[in-house]
């Protein structure tokens, strides 16, 4: 038999294995089937091992083609990954970005990559680790793949989100022993299981290979009992471990061994144990038990090196080097084996993953009714966070799939109205705390768990909201950044991942500097240039409703709303607020004759407007014209060329025009003011034509008795701002 067309470019073919004619005469997954019928069937075991070695071979050749990439970690999971696919469980995610070449190999072997023009091995090598090709790490941009993976310790969130949205489907997530504690992998699953005890259809698959990237893993000294106990201690009722060492007939030393060095018979026995174990684990997870599967096998099994030395390839590790080419020869399969592997994997799960993965179609959203606004009068006072909470409650009552997450507690964020309406999800009913087992508010004391579930739900197509104290958002932000970047290249529409951070630094005087960390706004500010990230600063209770309504209507974006939980003045009408969110900024004050010069204050934030307004009144009394402009959506104030907006999915190329910008910000002096750091003011400073300009912003935290005292400590006072404006005007005239 000649090799199938997709094998064009494969460098080495091998001889048929023993019993090939009887065990691989035809695919064990027949036409019209989606999985093997019996995991105990010797033919199923045999063909699962063929798939495992095919995965290893493609992984090593494609990484060798560029002298780049990471073959070793995935290689030690090959039997488990092949087993999952052969059993029809193809909605697989991972927390290990370094397993990308293996996941790409799986998508190549099931035919999914043909959707992006990769039809054979030559195509795959050409497109590997290239722009518009197979990205360096996993992304939902690749047909058949559900979620991104780069930073360790995130994949479990995607598996849990998938399980919550799709009962009855299994969501395996591979986890490396190097990344197992990085930082909250098991902790987040434990929290989720407490809140959602009936959602067990996600399956952690621990790839326990004894090594991390450059050394022995920190759990390499665990014995099998200790590892099993560790998972049981985190709430897993069923822990199934298959240890390659128990099948070794090659006399390998150490606790971690390479199954590809076994005799053929022992390789089949090991594969049979893995296949049966994965099948048992899958049925357990789908049957209502929190379950984990562990494959224990040496890192680098079957590729060019072992242990941490197999982790990645360097430029010298190319296909013409003996250690690479000889390793490929050892894994080489006969031509007819490749046809068997393709037929099996393209049928597993009901078809190629590019057709059957749950993320290949948009999830239908529950239609929302017209949301009721609270219309606050300009000049009155209202709490922004509470105003938003009322709107959030309406969303949750209309969309029962909607989840709100908050590690610090909605009540502490002046958003108790969310808990009143939607209830905190907890197995202990308690009306005093608004707790119910079926609640829609997820409040584990773990920012990563909160951000992770919200981000995972948004990526997989459902509405969610992550709420946090601004000071502690940094502990959950990494997965939000991962998801916003994934959304930028997603091939489908999905709801924006929406965050609201309150209890800003100026509100936290008595709590001291541990609760005063607004510097994260600089992080968000830098990400605005990504093209699909928006940092919103509503100045009042009307504007925060406009900001949240805007976020609800957005797709494939990351939206961060920063607002206070304090009683503050209302500056904008609802219509003015909607316009400011859409266009980028809005005037909240304009007065004075202008005989002494025109001063413009460009302000991000709400509470910091208090001293700005005081400074404005001082200056107006001296004959100056003063405009106070609330910078509500600074992403809209950049110039188009400043932002990679045209490189992202669902692009937004609307920016404030020069004429509109100049109408708001033209003056003799422009002073940017922020209650946090200065980066969000960058677009204003880039575009202003004011001949004199300066910035007042946060410096550092301190324990104070009031917001006024804390602003004074940071130089954010009316007197300081007015004095600086006078000096700049004088400089302008000299």
Label the predicted regions.
Residues 50-51, 343-495, 577-596, 605-607, ...:
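Non-catalytic terminal/interface segments that mediate subunit docking, oligomerization
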């Amino acid at each position: 038999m000649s090799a199938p067309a997709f094998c064009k470019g494969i460098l080495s073919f091998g001889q048929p294995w023993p019993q090939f004619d009887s065990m691989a005469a035809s695919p064990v997954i027949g036409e019209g089937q989606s999985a093997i019928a019996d995991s105990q069937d010797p033919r199923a075991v045999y063909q699962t091992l063929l798939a495992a070695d095919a995965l290893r071979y493609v992984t090593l050749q494609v990484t060798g083609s560029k002298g780049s990439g990471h073959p070793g970690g995935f290689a030690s999971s090959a039997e488990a990954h092949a087993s999952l696919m052969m059993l029809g469980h193809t909605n697989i995610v991972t927390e290990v970005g370094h397993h990308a070449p293996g996941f790409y190999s799986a998508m190549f072997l099931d035919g999914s990559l043909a959707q992006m023009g990769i039809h054979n091995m030559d195509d795959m090598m050409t497109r590997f680790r290239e722009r518009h090709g197979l990205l360096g790490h996993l992304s939902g941009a690749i047909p058949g793949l559900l979620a991104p993976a780069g930073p360790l310790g995130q994949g479990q969130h995607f598996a849990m989100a998938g399980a919550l949205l799709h009962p009855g489907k299994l969501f395996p997530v591979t986890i490396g022993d190097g990344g197992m504690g990085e930082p909250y992998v098991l902790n987040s699953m434990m929290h989720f299981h407490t809140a959602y005890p009936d959602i067990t259809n996600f399956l952690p698959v621990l790839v326990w290979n004894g090594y991390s990237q450059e050394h022995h893993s920190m759990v390499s000294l665990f014995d099998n009992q200790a590892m099993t106990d560790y998972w049981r201690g985190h709430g897993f009722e069923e822990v199934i471990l298959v240890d390659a060492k128990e099948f070794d007939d090659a006399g390998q030393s150490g606790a971690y061994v390479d199954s590809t060095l076994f005799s053929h018979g022992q390789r089949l026995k090991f594969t049979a144990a893995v296949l049966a174990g994965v099948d048992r684990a899958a049925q357990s997870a789908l049957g209502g038990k929190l379950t984990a599967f562990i494959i224990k096998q040496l890192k680098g099994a079957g590729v060019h090196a072992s242990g941490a030395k197999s982790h990645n390839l360097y430029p010298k590790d190319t296909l013409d080097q003996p250690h690479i080419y000889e390793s490929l020869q050892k894994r080489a399969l006969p031509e007819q084996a490749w046809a068997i592997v393709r037929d099996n994997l393209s049928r597993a799960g009901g078809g190629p993953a590019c057709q059957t993965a749950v993320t290949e179609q948009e999830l239908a959203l529950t239609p929302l009714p017209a949301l009721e606004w609270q219309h606050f009068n300009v000049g009155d006072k209202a709490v922004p966070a509470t105003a938003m909470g009322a709107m959030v409650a309406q969303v949750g009552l209309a969309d029962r799939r909607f989840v709100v997450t908050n590690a610090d507690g909605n009540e502490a964020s002046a958003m108790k109205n969310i808990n009143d309406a939607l209830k905190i999800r907890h197995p202990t009913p308690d009306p005093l705390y608004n707790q119910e087992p079926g609640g829609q508010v997820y409040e584990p004391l773990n920012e990563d768990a909160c951000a992770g579930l919200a981000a995972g739900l948004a990526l997989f197509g459902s509405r969610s909201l992550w709420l946090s104290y601004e000071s502690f958002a940094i502990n959950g932000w990494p997965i939000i950044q991962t998801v916003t970047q994934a959304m930028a290249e997603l091939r489908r529409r999905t709801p924006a991942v929406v965050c609201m951070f309150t209890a800003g630094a100026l509100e936290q005087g008595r709590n001291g500097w541990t609760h005063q960390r607004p510097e994260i706004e600089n992080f968000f500010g830098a990400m605005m240039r990504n093209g699909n990230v928006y940092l919103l600063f509503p100045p009042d209770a009307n504007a925060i409703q406009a900001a949240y309504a805007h976020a609800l209507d957005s797709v494939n974006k990351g939206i961060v709303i920063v607002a206070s939980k304090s009683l503050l003045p209302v500056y904008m009408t609802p219509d003015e607020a909607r316009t400011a969110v859409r266009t980028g900024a809005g005037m909240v004050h304009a007065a004075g004759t202008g005989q002494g010069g025109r001063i413009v204050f460009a302000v991000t934030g709400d509470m910091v407007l208090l001293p700005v307004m005081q400074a404005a009144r001082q200056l107006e009394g001296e004959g100056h014209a003063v405009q106070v402009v609330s910078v509500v959506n600074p992403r809209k104030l950049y110039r188009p060329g400043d932002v990679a907006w045209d490189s992202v999915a669902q692009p937004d190329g609307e920016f404030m025009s020069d004429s509109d910008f100049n109408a708001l910000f033209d003056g003799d002096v422009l002073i940017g003011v922020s209650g946090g750091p200065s980066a969000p003011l960058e677009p204003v400073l880039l575009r202003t034509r004011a001949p004199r300009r300066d910035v007042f912003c946060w410096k550092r935290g301190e324990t104070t008795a009031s917001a006024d005292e804390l602003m004074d400590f940071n130089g954010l006072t009316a007197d300081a701002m007015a004095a600086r404006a006078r000096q700049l005007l004088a400089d302008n005239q000299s």
